[in-house]
Regions:
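Non-transmembrane, aqueous-exposed alpha-helical and coiled segments at domain scale
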Residues: 1-7, 19-250
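Extended, polar beta-sheet/loop recognition surfaces of beta-rich domains
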Residues: 13
């Protein structure tokens, strides 16, 4: 619950459904005694992959199952010959804080406290650990998702530049009904030290704890607790009178 709350706050409202994310997180900790592993406890030579969800969380026909998540890892290993030694989430967000939890739990590998991004983001390049700046880096991305009964189930493996592979994965999400699970961008753990949001998951959990603690008194107190913890301030408050939610082009 704390991870879902804190992820939603740090994600800036992005990163998918906190309810769905918490369900996957609960499944992960039920399967094994999953623990969050600090980056400095990981061998620098360990190959780490990123787990993410790509697409439009508000799409009506979206569907990704736990089996789809595990199939992504299977396809990745089949294509690259690499068995990941650790996994990180691509970002903090309502649902995305939990990316990689189930895979780590079922594979028995570390869930590393070093998300690619401390907040939610819309494009694959934004969560690429600066790898898109290296013209020599060739990535492999695998993605799976979509309902079989609707004829939308897809499985893809793409290799190439991060920019072009990200666009292909986004296109796959559209064909799958709006969302796919993804495994991508293998790097050594040493690379994460300067290129990831080290400690981002534990920060989300503590943010959620402080917010939850404040909510026991009032919503206002919950917000104030978060402001004090993160060093923020309240700029405005009031009711939301109107908003627009649009799913288009896999976003």
């Amino acid at each position: 619950r704390w991870a879902a709350l804190g992820g939603s706050i740090l994600g800036g409202g992005g990163g998918g459904s906190a309810k769905t994310g918490a369900e996957f997180g609960d499944l992960a900790v039920r399967f094994s005694q999953l623990e969050l592993t600090p980056l400095d406890q990981i061998d620098p030579e360990t190959v780490v992959v990123t787990a993410s969800m790509v697409g439009a969380p508000a799409a009506q026909e979206k569907f990704v199952s736990p089996a789809d998540m595990m199939r992504c890892v299977e396809l990745f290993t089949q294509s690259t010959g690499i068995r990941p030694g650790g996994i990180v989430t691509n970002e903090n967000g309502g649902g995305s804080t939990f990316n990689g939890w189930l895979e780590a739990s079922m594979l028995g590998i570390p869930l590393i406290d070093a998300p690619c991004n401390g907040r939610a983001h819309p494009t694959g390049v934004m969560g690429s650990l600066n790898l898109h700046r290296d013209p020599n880096y060739i990535t492999t991305m695998t993605c799976v998702g979509g309902r079989k009964e609707l004829g939308r189930h897809v499985e893809c493996t793409v290799t190439g530049s991060i920019d072009h592979c990200s666009k292909l994965v986004r296109a796959a999400a559209v064909e799958a009904g709006g969302l796919v699970a993804v495994i991508r961008n293998p790097v050594k753990a040493s690379f994460l030290q300067k290129n990831s949001a080290v400690g981002g998951l534990s920060l989300a959990i503590e943010t959620g704890r402080r917010y939850s603690q404040g909510l026991e008194k009032s919503v206002e107190n919950g917000v104030q607790e978060v402001c004090e913890f993160l060093g923020g301030e309240i700029l405005a408050h009031g009711p939301v009178e109107e908003y627009q939610l649009r799913s288009e082009g896999g976003f």
